[in-house]
Amino acid sequence: YQQSYQHMRRLRFVAIIKQKTMTMNKRSIPANITATLAVGATATAPYYDVNITQQLCTPACVDETPVFAPSFTVKSIANVGTSQYLVVLHVEGVINYVPCNCGTCCTRSQVVSQDFTIPVFSATAISSITPSIGTVQNGIARIACCSCSKTFVSDVPLTLTIATA
C-alpha cells in the first residue's frame, strides 16, 4: 500500500509540474508602451515617438539587431472632455531575434499584440484618425559588461492624421 501511495503521489507531482510548465509557456509578458508627443507637433497631425519595451523569453545577443516591423490600427476614439479625445491604438508585430550562444542561423520570434492609448486635442469633432509610421529603430538593451539581454526596445515615429467632421 505504501509503495502504491508513493507512486500515485509521484505521478500527481509530475502532472502538476507539466501543467505549470504548459501554463508558463503560453503566458506572454505585456510590452511597456509609451507615446511621447514630439516638441512642435501640430494638432492636425500630431507626431509621437512610441517606445515599445518588451521582455523577451530568452536572452538575445546585444550585437545582433532584432527585426520588428509593427503595424498600428485605431480601435476607438472617445471624446473625454472639451476638445479632448482618447485614442485606443492596437500595435501588432513579430520580434525576430538571435538568442545568445546560438548563432545567426538560429532565430526566435515573439509576438507583440497589444492596445495602448494616446491623448489627442482637437477643437472640432474627430471623424477618423489614420496612423502612419516612419523608420523604426530596434535594439536589444545593453547592460554593462554583458553581451546578452532579455530587454527589446523599439522606437517608432508615429504620425496621426486627424480628419474632422
Give each language-model segment a name.
Residues 1-165:
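Viral structural modules
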